[in-house]
C-alpha cells in the first residue's frame, strides 16, 4: 500500500511539473509574440511616417542659402541638392495649398507648399490688379519696372485655391492679392527666371500629373527684401523633379536688402 501511494504521489508530481512547464512555455511564447507585434507595429508606424512626411527645404539649407552673396556676372540661379527635390511625392493626399503665416516682420519667410493637379491650371484672363505691398516694396517709376509682387505659388497653377488653401470649384481664378503668397521680387527674377520653373509645373499638370510644389523666399536676418527664392517640385509619377535657388537680382541695379531700396549700377550683370 505504501509503495502504491508513493507511486501515485510521484505520478501526480510529475504531471504537475509537466503542466507547469507547458504553461511557462505558453506564456513565454505569448510574450515573445506580443513583443514581436509591438516591434512590427512600431516599425510600420515609422515606415508610415517616412512615407507621409512632407520633406522639402530644411532649416539648415535655408540658412546656407541665406549666406550666399550674388556676384556680378553670375548665373541667375543655381541647383540645390544637385537639382533634385527633397519633397516626398507620397505626401500628396488632397488638392490644397499650405500657406505659412507671416513672420513677426510680416514677411513670407517660410515655405508655401502646394499639392496640385490639372484643375489648378488657371485662366490668365481672370487676373486682376495687384495692390498688396509686401515687405521691401518700393513703387516703380515709368519706364523702370524693377519691382514685382512675386508669387510663391504662381497664379497660373493655383486655380480654385482660396486664401485658406482649400480647393473651391466656384473659384475659377488663381491666387491673387494674398499677403501670405507674395514677396518683393525683381522683375528679372520673376519674369525671366522663375517663370521657367512655373512653366515646368504647368506642363506637368496638363499631362495629368499630380505635383508637390514648394516655394520658400530666403531672407537674411531681419532684412525686408528676400535674397532669393528656393523652388522645388516633384511629380508623383517621377516625371518632374527640380530644386533650384533663384537670386533676387536685376541687371543694372543693386539692392539694399535691408530696406529693398534700389540704386542704378550699369555694370551689374546677370547671366
Give the predicted meaning of each segment.
Residues 1-11:
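N-terminal Lys/Arg-rich, disordered targeting/topogenic segments
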Residues 12, 40-42, 246:
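Intrinsically disordered, low-complexity peptide-like regions
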Residues 15-29:
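Hydrophobic membrane-insertion alpha-helices, especially the h-region
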Residues 28-39, 231-234:
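Hydrophobic single-pass membrane-insertion segments
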Residues 33-89:
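N-terminal, intrinsically disordered, polar/charged segments of Gram-positive cell-envelope systems
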Residues 68-117, 244:
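Polybasic, low-complexity association/targeting segments
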Residues 109-271:
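Domain-level detector of nuclease and nuclease-like folds
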Amino acid at each position: 500500500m505504501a509503495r502504491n501511494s508513493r507511486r501515485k504521489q510521484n505520478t501526480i508530481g510529475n504531471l504537475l511539473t509537466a503542466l507547469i512547464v507547458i504553461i511557462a512555455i505558453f506564456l513565454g511564447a505569448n510574450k515573445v509574440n506580443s513583443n514581436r507585434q509591438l516591434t512590427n507595429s512600431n516599425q510600420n508606424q515609422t515606415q508610415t511616417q517616412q512615407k507621409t512626411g512632407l520633406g522639402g527645404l530644411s532649416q539648415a539649407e535655408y540658412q546656407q542659402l541665406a549666406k550666399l552673396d550674388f556676384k556680378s556676372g553670375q548665373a541667375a540661379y543655381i541647383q540645390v541638392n544637385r537639382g533634385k527635390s527633397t519633397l516626398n511625392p507620397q505626401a500628396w493626399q488632397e488638392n490644397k495649398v499650405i500657406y505659412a503665416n507671416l513672420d513677426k516682420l510680416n514677411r513670407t519667410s517660410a515655405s508655401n507648399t502646394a499639392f496640385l493637379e490639372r484643375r489648378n491650371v488657371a485662366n490668365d484672363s481672370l487676373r486682376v490688379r495687384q495692390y498688396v505691398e509686401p515687405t521691401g516694396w518700393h513703387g516703380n517709376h515709368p519706364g523702370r519696372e524693377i519691382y514685382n509682387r512675386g508669387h510663391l505659388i504662381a497664379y497660373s497653377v493655383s486655380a480654385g485655391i482660396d486664401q485658406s488653401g482649400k480647393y473651391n470649384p466656384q473659384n475659377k481664378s488663381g491666387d491673387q492679392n494674398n499677403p501670405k503668397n507674395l514677396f518683393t521680387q525683381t522683375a528679372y527674377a520673376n519674369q525671366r527666371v522663375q517663370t521657367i520653373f512655373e512653366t515646368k509645373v504647368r506642363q506637368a499638370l496638363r499631362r495629368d500629373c499630380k505635383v508637390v510644389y514648394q516655394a520658400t523666399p530666403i531672407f537674411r536676418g531681419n532684412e525686408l527684401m528676400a535674397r532669393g527664392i528656393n523652388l522645388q517640385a516633384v511629380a508623383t509619377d517621377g516625371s518632374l523633379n527640380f530644386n533650384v535657388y533663384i537670386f533676387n537680382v536685376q541687371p543694372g541695379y543693386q539692392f539694399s536688402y535691408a530696406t529693398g531700396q534700389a540704386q542704378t549700377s550699369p555694370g551689374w550683370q546677370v547671366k
